[in-house]
C-alpha cells in the first residue's frame, strides 16, 4: 500500500464547472475520498485513489487527541497539506443515529454536520465500523482470510455476518441480492450472555454480581477477557494475579494453566455467540470473525472449541454444519468497506 498522490478540485473550479487537467483527464472527474476506521482505542485514516485503492494508511492513538476532528486535521495536514478530499466515509465504533455518534468505548462524539463544516467536504457519511467490515467481506483477497473449521463455500448471495472482539464487541450483517448488497448495523455485543454449561452459569453469576446485567461484551472483548480470567480464578479458588488482558495472553504463551483455560473458554463462548448470530441473520453466506483479539488466537480458534460450539445448536445443528466460519486477517478491512461505501451516490451530509 505505497502512498500515491491524491488530488481534490479547488472550490473555485467546482463552482464554475471548470475541470483542471491531469494526464488527459479533468480533476473534476477523478474519484477521491477520505476513509476512516475509528475504534475504541485506535483511529485509522487513509485516502482512496481514483481506482478505489487504499493509500497512505496511518494509525493514531486516540488517547493523544481530544476529538476526532483533531485526528482528521492532523492526518490531512501531514498527508495532503492544503489539499482536501471531496468526500469522506468514516466507519465508527458505535451506533450512528441521525448522523451522529457518541462513541461507546471512549469519550469522543462526532457528527456528519460538524465534519462537513470543519473540512468543507462535498459530502461526509458516518457508518458503523462492523457494517463497513460487512461491506468489505465479499471483496477481501483469499490470502487475507483463514478458514476456521471445515473448508466450506458460503451460499451465493446469502446473508453473511461479521463479528469481532476488540475494545468492545461488534456485529453487523450483509443482505445480498443481484441488485446489490445492503449492510445491517447492529449492537449485538450488548445482547445478554447465555451460558452453555455449569462453569458458564457460575461465570454469569460472578459477573452479574459485579455488573448487574452481563452482556456478551463483558466477556468477548479486551476488558472482557480479563473479566473472564477473574471469574475463572474465583471458581478455581486461586488468586487473579494477572493485571489485564495483555498479561493473560502473555501468560498463556508461557504455559500458565488458568490463562490457557481463559483463552480456551473465550474461544468456546465466541463460537456459541457466532452460532447464535448465524441463526439470527440466516447467515448461509458465512460468519466472518474480525476484531483485535481473534487474529492473535487464530491457531486456538482453529483447533479448540470454537467450531464445535458454533455447530451445537440442537435441531439446527445440521443447518449450522453447512455455514463457513472465516477469520479476517486483512489489516484494513473496515477501510476497504468504507471505500466501497464511498463509491455509492453521495449520502450523509452534503
Language model regions located:
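Short beta-strand-loop/turn "lid" adjacent to the catalytic site in phosphate-handling enzymes
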Residues: 80-126, 131, 135-144, 162, ...
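ATP-dependent carbohydrate kinase catalytic cores
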Residues: 123-155, 246-267, 272
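ATP-binding/phosphotransfer module of carbohydrate and carboxylate kinases, centering on a glycine-rich
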Residues: 7-9, 13, 22-80, 84, ...
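Glycine-rich phosphate-binding loop of actin/hexokinase-like ATP-binding domains
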Residues: 147, 151, 155-216, 298, ...
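Short, acidic Gly/Pro/Ser/Thr-rich loop/turn segments
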Residues: 43, 95-97, 168-172, 227, ...
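Short glycine-aspartate micro-motif
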Residues: 33-37, 87-89, 125, 160-164, ...
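Active-site nucleophile and cofactor-binding loops and adjacent substrate-binding regions
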Residues: 61, 105-106, 125-132, 151-154, ...
Amino acid at each position: 500500500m505505497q502512498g500515491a498522490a491524491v488530488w481534490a478540485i479547488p472550490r473555485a473550479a467546482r463552482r464554475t464547472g471548470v475541470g483542471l487537467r491531469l494526464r488527459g483527464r479533468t480533476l473534476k472527474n477523478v474519484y477521491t475520498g477520505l476513509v476512516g476506521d475509528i475504534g475504541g482505542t485506535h483511529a485509522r485514516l487513509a485516502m482512496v485513489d481514483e481506482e478505489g485503492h487504499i493509500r497512505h494508511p496511518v494509525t493514531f492513538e486516540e488517547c493523544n487527541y481530544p476529538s476526532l476532528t483533531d485526528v482528521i486535521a492532523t492526518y490531512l495536514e501531514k498527508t495532503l497539506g492544503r489539499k482536501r478530499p471531496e468526500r469522506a466515509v468514516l466507519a465508527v465504533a458505535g451506533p450512528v443515529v441521525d448522523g451522529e455518534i457518541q462513541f461507546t468505548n471512549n469519550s469522543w462524539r462526532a457528527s456528519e454536520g460538524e465534519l462537513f463544516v470543519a473540512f468543507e467536504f462535498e459530502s461526509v457519511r458516518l457508518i458503523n465500523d462492523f457494517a463497513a467490515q460487512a461491506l468489505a467481506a465479499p471483496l477481501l483477497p483469499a490470502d487475507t482470510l483463514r478458514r476456521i473449521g471445515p473448508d466450506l463455500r458460503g451460499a451465493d448471495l446469502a446473508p453473511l455476518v461479521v463479528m469481532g472482539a476488540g475494545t468492545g464487541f461488534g456485529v453487523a450483517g450483509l443482505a445480498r441480492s443481484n441488485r446489490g448488497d445492503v449492510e445491517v448495523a447492529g449492537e449485538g455485543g450488548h445482547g445478554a450472555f447465555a451460558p452453555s454449561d455449569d462453569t458458564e452459569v457460575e461465570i454469569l453469576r460472578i459477573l452479574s454480581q459485579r455488573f448487574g446485567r452481563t452482556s456478551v461484551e463483558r466477556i468477548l472483548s479486551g476488558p472482557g477477557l480479563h473479566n473472564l480470567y477473574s471469574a475463572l480464578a474465583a471458581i478455581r479458588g486461586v488468586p487473579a494475579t494477572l493485571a489485564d488482558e495483555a498479561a493473560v495472553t502473555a501468560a498463556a504463551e508461557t504455559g500458565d494453566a488458568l490463562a490457557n483455560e481463559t483463552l480456551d473458554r473465550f474461544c468456546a463462548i465466541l463460537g456459541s455467540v457466532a452460532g447464535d448470530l448465524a441463526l439470527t441473520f440466516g447467515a448461509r453466506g458465512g460468519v466472518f470473525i474480525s476484531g483485535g483479539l481473534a487474529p492473535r488466537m487464530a491457531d486456538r480458534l482453529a483447533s479448540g472449541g470454537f467450531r464445535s460450539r458454533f455447530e451445537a445448536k440442537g435441531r439446527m445443528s445440521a443447518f449450522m454444519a453447512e455455514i463457513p466460519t472465516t477469520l479476517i486477517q486483512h489489516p484494513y478491512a473496515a477501510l476497504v468497506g468504507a471505500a466501497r461505501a464511498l463509491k455509492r451516490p453521495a449520502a450523509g451530509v452534503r
